[in-house]
């Protein structure tokens, strides 16, 4: 047979000679099957093994293993050749598809072939012998291996690691049980039930029941002892977890040696069927000896006290703790519940044992006259009444609250009482210690805050600070940490980048939602900004920014109200979602206004270095900031050569395309028009005396740059100079026609412009229609303000959401210029509104008219 036939290999029989003569004739075809092709001539290098044609070889055995192949198709030539025939299918058995039959002849040689032939013998029905047994073995073997579930993935890290652990179990040997397998889980749970039953029932049975030969008692002992003996055997085949390095031992020899050195003796002694020995020996014991032999029942009770049972209970508690983690329970809650349950269970179990011991000792002494049972005449009472009195006596001793109904009189009772007190005091101290540690661990952040504040109090006492200073420090800590202290930088620093960004975005979600700059910007830009923010808290009266100092930070208001103050005693309120101090991040100049906290303020600060670092990755945002800042400085008569040189260099080098330059110019134009509109709104007598027009902030208009940089398609122009498709930037058209006075073009006459002061501030308070700063007048009551109309910045309040953006053609204002006019407004425009105008304004506000339209109406009536 050649090597392809599988019946033999060259070199199997070195002494054989090639078969001479012509090739043998092909075998006769079988009647029910098609004729197989003729066999090829024998290979001269292959030795011939003439055997019986009816003896199947390895290939024929392989063929006969499938019930769909006929045995007749597996026969080959006379010299052991193999030929491939047509697919042969048998109508009997389940449909498995056509099988390709091999015509083989010749016996296999060698031990490997014999082993293969022996393992592939077919049964009478064509199925391999032992296939059903192999299936059951595979299923049971899977129970002995760790499954792919949440617990195993958490323990081993990945599915591939679990598969490697499964291969370890397979290679360790037959019937090796993994400690994290499903079989061990169910077995430990079953042993828990038997263990609890033994810990509770056996002491009661030994102490309060005299007849131990009843059927229920025998059945309970037989079943429990059988399971304990089975557990003893399974412990030799169960892997051992090394707690130090989390290694799992699966080698049978190592498991046996370690188990024999540790808990085998205790487990073996506790699993001996002592009750069976009592039943056998009791038949040959007379009544006089039986009384002394009854003391042997203590052996059964000592088995309950085996440390192995308590160790299994603690192991089950660890399993429960792991299950609670799998079911997404919090760590503190799970550990607290399990520790409390363990302590309560141990206390109750010890009280139960002590109560049984209080009655067991007098019973072994045949109830002497000075024992508590004889004194109370309770010898013949029911076992439930005796157990209740004994348990009450034991708990009184263990809790150190008394001696029970009467003090001990006999020496035995005295020693039992002292033993109960010692055990009870120890358990009570352990319970108090664990409970105290448990309470502290449940609120470690509050405990850390209290420890920190104690140091602060000692510091204040050492420096003898006044009482008002101490109260301010106390209030600061209360509002800054709110009774809990965390090392937030350390916690966030230990997380990976994506998770840290998600947490920062979640913590600042209210800030992002309340700021148009963040709400319309690129998410990557917003994330980069948020990760640089630092949380700060200021008390009422604290000056967050002082005028004349160098600007190193800008602030975003999360909660609170601040006042922006200038040397001209002008004041403007900023609240949640506003920000201030932004221009100094670009110019690195000095502050032009002071900012004071009116309430407790929770702010996020951004340093100039971090801000510039973020802008390095977004040049479009930097260019927009710089261009608007230059235009604002030019309008107040100031220049910054560094910013001017950078912008001119960008224009000359062509860094930005025409579309981006057009967007930036539109932002500058929109910024100018917002300043002029704010100036116009302040000259309607809403905020007497009329403040000078101020310069807007770059950040208030950068939301449009962000939106257009990522969405160049500009929405249809509505009313304002620039309207984007963003829902936060669209200015809706007014519901009614504009007043007649608001005609296109500048007014016929404009007031003379006052000379601008060289010390005009770069960040000064002013208001626009709809901002809190301009709604304090009698014409627009403050109670009709909406939160959406709050100012966005210390230097640029925002228009109210939903209000129409005024355009140069639709606004009655003087002609625009690069530098706004400064100085007082004409007296005709600052006159106090008449009662008629006030009455006319109220219905408009009540009917839903926009505040900006109301201001325009009053302005037209003045004109």
From Swiss-Prot:
* Residue segments, region Disordered: 1-131, 730-863
How is this protein situated with respect to the membrane?
Multi-pass membrane protein
What are the transmembrane regions?
Answer: 189-209, 214-234, 262-282, 291-311, 343-363, 414-434
Q: Which residue spans belong to the Cytoplasmic compartment?
A: 1-188, 235-261, 312-342, 435-863
In its record, the post-translational modification comment is: Phosphorylation at Ser-641 by PRKG2 shifts the voltage-dependence to more negative voltages, hence counteracting the stimulatory effect of cGMP on gating.
Q: Which UniProt keywords apply?
A: Ammonia transport, cAMP, cAMP-binding, Cell membrane, Glycoprotein, Ion channel, Ion transport, Ligand-gated ion channel, Lipoprotein, Membrane, Methylation, Nucleotide-binding, Palmitate, Phosphoprotein, Potassium, Potassium channel, Potassium transport, Sodium, Sodium channel, Sodium transport, Transmembrane, Transmembrane helix, Transport, Voltage-gated channel
Stored SUPFAM superfamilies: cAMP-binding domain-like, Voltage-gated potassium channels
Query: A biological process (GO) annotation for this entry?
Result: potassium ion import across plasma membrane
Composition skew (Gly residues), residue ranges: 1-10
Q: Which GO terms describe its cellular component?
A: axon; dendrite; dendrite membrane; dendritic shaft; HCN channel complex; membrane; neuronal cell body; plasma membrane
Q: Which Gene3D superfamilies match?
A: 1.10.287.70, Helix hairpin bin, Jelly Rolls
Biased composition of type Low complexity is found at 106-128, 756-765, 778-834
Intramembrane features: residues?
A: 387-408
State where composition is biased (Pro residues).
Answer: 17-47, 734-755
Does Cell membrane count among this protein's keywords? yes
Q: What does this protein do?
A: Hyperpolarization-activated ion channel exhibiting weak selectivity for potassium over sodium ions. Contributes to the native pacemaker currents in heart (If) and in neurons (Ih). Can also transport ammonium in the distal nephron. Involved in the initiation of neuropathic pain in sensory neurons. Produces a large instantaneous current.
What family is reported?
Belongs to the potassium channel HCN family.
What name does the UniProt record give this protein? Potassium/sodium hyperpolarization-activated cyclic nucleotide-gated channel 2
Originating organism: Rattus norvegicus (Rat)
């Amino acid at each position: 047979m050649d090597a392809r036939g599988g019946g033999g290999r060259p070199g199997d029989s070195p002494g054989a000679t090639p078969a001479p003569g012509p090739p043998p004739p092909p075998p006769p075809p079988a009647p029910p099957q098609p004729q197989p092709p003729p066999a090829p001539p024998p290979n001269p290098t292959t030795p011939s093994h003439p055997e019986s044609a009816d003896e199947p070889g390895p290939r024929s055995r392989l063929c006969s293993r499938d019930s769909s192949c006929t045995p007749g198709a597996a026969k080959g030539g006379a010299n052991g050749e193999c030929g491939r025939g047509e697919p042969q299918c048998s109508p009997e058995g389940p449909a498995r598809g056509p099988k390709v039959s091999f015509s083989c002849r010749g016996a296999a040689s060698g031990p490997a072939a014999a082993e293969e032939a022996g393992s592939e013998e077919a049964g009478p029905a064509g199925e391999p012998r032992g296939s059903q047994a192999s299936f059951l073995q595979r299923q049971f073997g899977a129970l002995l291996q760790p499954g792919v579930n949440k617990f195993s993935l958490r323990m081993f890290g990945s599915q591939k690691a679990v598969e490697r652990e499964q291969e370890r179990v397979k290679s360790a040997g037959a019937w090796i049980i993994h400690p994290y397998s499903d079989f061990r889980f169910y077995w430990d749970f079953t042993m828990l039930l038997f263990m609890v039953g033994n810990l509770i029932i056996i002491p009661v049975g030994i102490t309060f029941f005299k007849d131990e030969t009843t059927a229920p008692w025998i059945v309970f002992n037989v079943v429990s002892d059988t399971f304990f003996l089975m557990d003893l055997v399974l412990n030799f085949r169960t892997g051992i977890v090394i707690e130090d390095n989390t290694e799992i031992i699966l080698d049978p020899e190592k498991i046996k040696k370690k188990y024999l050195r540790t808990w085998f003796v205790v487990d073996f002694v506790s699993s001996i069927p002592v009750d069976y020995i009592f039943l056998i020996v009791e038949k040959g014991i007379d009544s006089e000896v039986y009384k002394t032999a009854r003391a042997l029942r203590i052996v059964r009770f000592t088995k309950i006290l085996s440390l192995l049972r308590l160790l299994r209970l603690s192991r089950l508690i660890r399993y429960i703790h792991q299950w609670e983690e799998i079911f997404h329970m919090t760590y503190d809650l799970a550990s607290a519940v399990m520790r409390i349950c363990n302590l309560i269970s141990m206390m109750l179990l010890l009280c139960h044992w002590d109560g049984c011991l209080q009655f067991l000792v007098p019973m072994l002494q045949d109830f002497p006259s000075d024992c508590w049972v004889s004194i109370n005449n309770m010898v013949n009472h029911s076992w439930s009444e005796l157990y209740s009195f004994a348990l009450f006596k034991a708990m009184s001793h263990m809790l150190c609250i008394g001696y029970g109904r009467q003090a001990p009189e006999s020496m035995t009772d005295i020693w039992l009482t002292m033993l109960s007190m010692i055990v009870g005091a120890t358990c009570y101290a352990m319970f108090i210690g664990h409970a105290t540690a448990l309470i502290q661990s449940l609120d470690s952040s509050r405990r850390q805050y209290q420890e920190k504040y104690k140091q602060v109090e000692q510091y204040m006492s050492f420096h003898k600070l006044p009482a008002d200073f101490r109260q301010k420090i106390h209030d600061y800590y209360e509002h800054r940490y709110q009774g809990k202290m965390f090392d937030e930088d350390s916690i966030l620093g230990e997380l990976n980048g994506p998770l840290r960004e998600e947490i920062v975005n979640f913590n600042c979600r209210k800030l992002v939602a309340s700021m148009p700059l963040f709400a319309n910007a690129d998410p990557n830009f917003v994330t980069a900004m948020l990760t640089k923010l630092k949380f700060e808290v200021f008390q009422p009266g604290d000056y967050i920014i002082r005028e004349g100092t160098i600007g190193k930070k800008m602030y975003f208001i999360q909660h609170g109200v601040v006042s922006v103050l200038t040397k001209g005693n002008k004041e403007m309120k900023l609240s949640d979602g506003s920000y201030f101090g932004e221009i100094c991040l670009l110019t690195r100049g000095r502050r032009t206004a002071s900012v004071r906290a009116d309430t407790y303020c929770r702010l996020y600060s951004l340093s100039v270095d971090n801000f510039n670092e973020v802008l390095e990755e977004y040049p479009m945002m930097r260019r927009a900031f710089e261009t608007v800042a230059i235009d604002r400085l030019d309008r107040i008569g100031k220049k910054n050569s560094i910013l001017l040189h950078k912008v001119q260099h960008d224009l000359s080098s062509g860094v930005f395309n025409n579309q981006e330059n057009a967007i930036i110019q539109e932002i500058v134009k929109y910024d100018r028009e917002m300043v002029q509109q704010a100036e116009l709104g302040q000259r309607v007598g809403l905020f007497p005396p009329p403040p000078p027009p101020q310069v807007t902030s770059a950040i208030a208009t950068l939301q449009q740059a962000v939106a257009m940089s990522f969405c160049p398609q500009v929405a249809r122009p509505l009313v304002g100079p620039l309207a984007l498709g963003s829902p936060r930037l669209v200015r809706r058209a007014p519901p009614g026609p504009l007043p007649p006075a608001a005609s296109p073009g500048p007014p016929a006459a404009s007031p003379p412009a006052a000379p601008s002061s060289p010390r005009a501030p770069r960040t000064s308070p002013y208001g626009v229609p709809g901002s809190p700063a301009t709604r304090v007048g009698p014409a627009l009551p403050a109670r009709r303000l909406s939160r959406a109309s709050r100012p966005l910045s210390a230097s640029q309040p925002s228009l109210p959401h939903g209000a129409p953006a005024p355009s140069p053609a639709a606004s009655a204002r003087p002609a625009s210029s690069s530098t706004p006019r400064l100085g007082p407004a004409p007296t005709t425009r600052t006159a106090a509104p008449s009662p008629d105008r006030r009455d006319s304004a109220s219905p408009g506000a009540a009917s839903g008219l926009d505040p900006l339209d109301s201001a325009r109406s009053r302005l037209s009536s003045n004109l």
